[in-house]
A protein has these predicted regions:
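N-terminal strand-loop element at the rim of the active site
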Residues: 5-64
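Short His-centered aromatic/hydrophobic patch
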Residues: 84-90, 106
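Donor nucleotide-sugar binding/catalytic pocket of nucleotide-sugar-dependent glycosyltransferases
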Residues: 111, 126-162
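Nucleotide-activated donor-binding/catalytic signature segment of Leloir-type glycosyltransferases, i.e.
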Residues: 216-233
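Conserved acidic donor-binding segment of nucleotide-sugar-dependent glycosyltransferases
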Residues: 288-297, 304-311
Length: 348
């Protein structure tokens, strides 16, 4: 079986790139012939993280320029099945023209405006043989009638797995980019006004971003005690910090497509406090706590609530959120089965 993966790429080893390579690895290990095309998007800059990830793979991985339809067409012609990551019209049309099965993984919620790219994506999605959406939220924005040619498969490549003993955990952790609408300012204000012992409940802010100077100024101006800022950390150190927290706090106001940080936390038995934002409540699971996006008072009350939970109840909650996650995630070998089904449908 020849499988072609095509995905837009900004040049870093981000969530989409990691997932594309994880699925390609799985199928390659099962004996399939695999090729990966990363289509450069505007502002593409190849980072060391992606370069290193590519170097250890044994199957062909190429970067193509925007508008390189000839390479796409030749690659689709080679394939038995094409797996597009997000609805790229040139990919779907090439597969349709060459009568090749084409499936999609759709990462982003559907914009219903008339700008060219959303319109082209909607057309491409309708023409594909099957589409998987990464969350119920994303799925509903594209196909609220849940047609037979669509389904849900959360995208997860590699997750942290080292679990810190409950007795060695403390406080809260935030692990998102420091940009507007990710909720870091809301969280700081809520943490500042919450009536909790900051020495026992520190707040660790992982990551970095354009709001760094504003965040540092806010902490100093308002005299917010208990905040720790480790800066940008390598993955293994970042994952360790997450596992050492009692709660992951993810409070965006931006229509999150899924919410990978919540899934990462749950995989090391760290429960979550989130906002009712896009697919985030689904990612955080039914054992999470939640509030309205941007509501500082509600978030502060949740911080106070969890600080009063008994250790016994906390452990039960953490175990429950982990085991629910195990049933939520799906193994990558499901894709091999799905490819075989769609190929057979073309042969009948």
């Amino acid at each position: 079986m020849n499988i072609l993966y095509i995905s837009p790429c900004q040049g870093a080893f981000g969530g989409i790139e990691a997932f594309v390579l994880a699925v390609a690895d799985e199928l390659y290990s099962c004996g399939a012939s695999v090729q990966v095309l990363f289509k450069k998007v505007k502002g593409f800059q190849l980072k060391d993280s992606l370069q290193q990830a590519i170097q250890i793979r044994r199957y062909p991985i190429r970067f193509i320029a925007r508008g390189d339809f000839a390479t796409i067409f030749r690659s689709v012609k080679w394939a038995d099945v094409v797996h597009g990551h997000n609805p790229l019209l040139e990919v779907v049309v090439s597969a349709l023209w060459l009568r090749k099965p084409c499936v999609l993984t759709v990462y982003n919620w559907c914009r219903k405006n008339l700008h060219p790219r959303p319109v082209l994506w909607r057309v491409a999605n309708k023409l594909a043989d099957h589409s998987w959406y990464i969350s119920d939220f994303v799925w509903n924005t594209w196909d609220d009638k849940r047609q037979d040619k669509s389904g849900k498969l959360p995208i997860v490549s590699s997750l942290p797995s080292r679990v810190t003993p409950y007795k060695d955990r403390a406080g809260f952790i935030f692990a998102s980019r420091w940009i507007p609408n990710k909720g870091i300012r809301t969280l700081l204000q809520a943490y500042s006004m919450s009536n909790i012992d900051k020495s026992k409940w520190p707040l660790v802010l992982l990551g970095d971003g354009p709001l760094r100077e504003e965040v540092l100024a806010m902490i100093e101006r308002d005299g917010i005690h208990g905040v720790e800022i480790p800066g940008f950390l390598p993955d293994h150190e970042r994952n360790l910090k997450i596992s050492q927290a009692k709660w992951m706090i993810t409070p965006p106001k931006t229509n999150e497509d899924l919410g990978l940080t919540a899934i990462e936390a749950r995989n090391v038995k760290v429960p979550c406090i989130v906002t009712h934002d896009g697919g985030l409540p689904e990612a955080a699971g039914k054992f999470s706590l939640s509030c309205q996006p941007g509501n500082i008072v509600e978030l502060a009350e949740l911080l106070e609530t969890v600080s009063l939970i008994s250790e016994e109840d906390y452990i039960q909650l953490a175990e429950n959120t982990y085991f629910q996650l195990r049933s939520y995630l799906k193994p990558l070998n499901l894709y091999r089965q799905a490819y075989q089904v769609v190929i057979r449908s073309y042969q009948e």
